[in-house]
């Protein structure tokens, strides 16, 4: 099963993914993959990191000072996706009960290797929980085993409970 969480910027996608990760880990499931938290400097968003959930390794994904392909005002470090994110996701495919990818969006998709790896995950039997940028969603939601949830601040808790129910019904869970 693939659970994709989408919504407007600031709607709570990453918070939802984090709550689901905590729930699964609390139930004894192993979780791997990546998160991409923002980096703030002086109260302003300066960039984004990529963090390997299993090892805690981190690297700079994008910043206002990074050279590389641009997404808005951020330069993207494609190398960190290839060297840190892709191995983290591939390892999670082999070793973990659930893969977390937060987020599948324009910055992350600048890496061809990351795109290939996401396609592999989508074609696998592994449970995936991912935050997905709205514009990216259209190209990947056509698969039968994909469940898409739209998060907004008003119905965030209701969506969380629906996903928990779905996970409880998922026959691949222990």
Curated annotation (Swiss-Prot):
Q: Which UniProt keywords apply?
A: ATP-binding, Hydrolase, Nucleotide-binding
One matching Pfam family: NTPase_1
Name the top EC class: hydrolase
Catalyses which reaction(s): a ribonucleoside 5'-triphosphate + H2O = a ribonucleoside 5'-diphosphate + phosphate + H(+)
Q: Which domain of life is it from?
A: Archaea
Q: Where does ATP bind?
A: 7-14, 98-105
Q: Which GO terms describe its molecular function?
A: ATP binding; ribonucleoside triphosphate phosphatase activity
State its Enzyme Commission number(s). 3.6.1.15
UniProt-listed CDD domains: RecA-like_Thep1
Give the family, as the similarity comment puts it. Answer: Belongs to the THEP1 NTPase family.
Sorted alphabetically, which PANTHER family does this protein's record hold? CANCER-RELATED NUCLEOSIDE-TRIPHOSPHATASE (PTHR43146:SF1)
Q: What is the recorded function of this protein according to its Swiss-Prot or TrEMBL entry?
A: Has nucleotide phosphatase activity towards ATP, GTP, CTP, TTP and UTP. May hydrolyze nucleoside diphosphates with lower efficiency.
Protein name according to UniProt: Nucleoside-triphosphatase THEP1
Q: Which organism is it from?
A: Methanothermobacter thermautotrophicus (strain ATCC 29096 / DSM 1053 / JCM 10044 / NBRC 100330 / Delta H) (Methanobacterium thermoautotrophicum)
Q: Provide the taxonomic classification.
A: Archaea, Methanobacteriati, Methanobacteriota, Methanomada group, Methanobacteria
């Amino acid at each position: 099963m693939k659970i994709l969480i989408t919504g407007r910027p600031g709607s709570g996608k990453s918070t939802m993914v984090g709550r689901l990760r905590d729930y699964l880990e609390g139930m004894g499931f192993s979780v791997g993959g990546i998160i991409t938290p923002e980096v703030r400097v002086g109260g302003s968003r300066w960039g984004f990191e990529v963090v390997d959930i299993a090892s805690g390794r981190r690297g700079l994904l994008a910043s206002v000072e990074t050279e590389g392909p641009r997404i808005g005002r951020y330069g993207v470090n494609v190398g960190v996706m290839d060297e840190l994110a892709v191995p983290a996701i591939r390892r999670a495919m082999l070793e973990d009960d659930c893969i977390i990818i937060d987020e599948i969006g324009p910055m992350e998709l600048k890496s061809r290797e990351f795109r290939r790896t996401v396609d592999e995950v989508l074609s696998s039997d592994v449970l995936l929980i991912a935050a997905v940028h709205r514009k990216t969603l259209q190209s990947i939601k056509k698969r039968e085993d994909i469940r898409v949830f739209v998060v907004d601040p008003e119905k965030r808790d209701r969506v969380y409970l629906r996903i928990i129910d779905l996970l409880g019904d998922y026959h691949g869970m222990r």
